[in-house]
């Protein structure tokens, strides 16, 4: 199975589907690693990327 990590890519449609919301605030996590959350920033959102 593919693993995912957080990245700062804007155009990643694949990442959008595999993001999950974290319990803490509005942060979103990667499917495989729930501990690492993607934070929302001003101009972009950090998303999950395959590695």
Swiss-Prot record:
Q: Which UniProt keywords apply?
A: Chromosome, Developmental protein, Differentiation, Disulfide bond, DNA condensation, DNA-binding, Nucleosome core, Nucleus, Phosphoprotein, Spermatogenesis
Example GO CC term: the record gives: nucleosome
InterPro entries recorded: Protamine_P1 (IPR000221)
Q: What protein name applies here? A: Sperm protamine P1
Q: In which tissues is it expressed?
A: Testis.
Function as written in the Swiss-Prot or TrEMBL entry: Protamines substitute for histones in the chromatin of sperm during the haploid phase of spermatogenesis. They compact sperm DNA into a highly condensed, stable and inactive complex.
Keyword Nucleus recorded: yes
- Where's it found, cell-wise? Nucleus; Chromosome
- Listed GO biological process terms: chromosome condensation; nucleus organization; sperm DNA condensation; spermatid development
- Source organism, top-level taxon: Eukaryota
Task: Note the Pfam families from the entry.
Answer: Protamine_P1
Q: What is the scientific name of the source organism?
A: Mus musculus (Mouse)
């Amino acid at each position: 199975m593919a693993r995912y990590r957080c990245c700062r890519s804007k155009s990643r449609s694949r990442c959008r589907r595999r993001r999950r919301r974290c319990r803490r605030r509005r942060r979103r996590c990667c499917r495989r690693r729930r501990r690492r959350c993607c934070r929302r920033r001003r101009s972009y959102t950090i998303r999950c990327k395959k590695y």
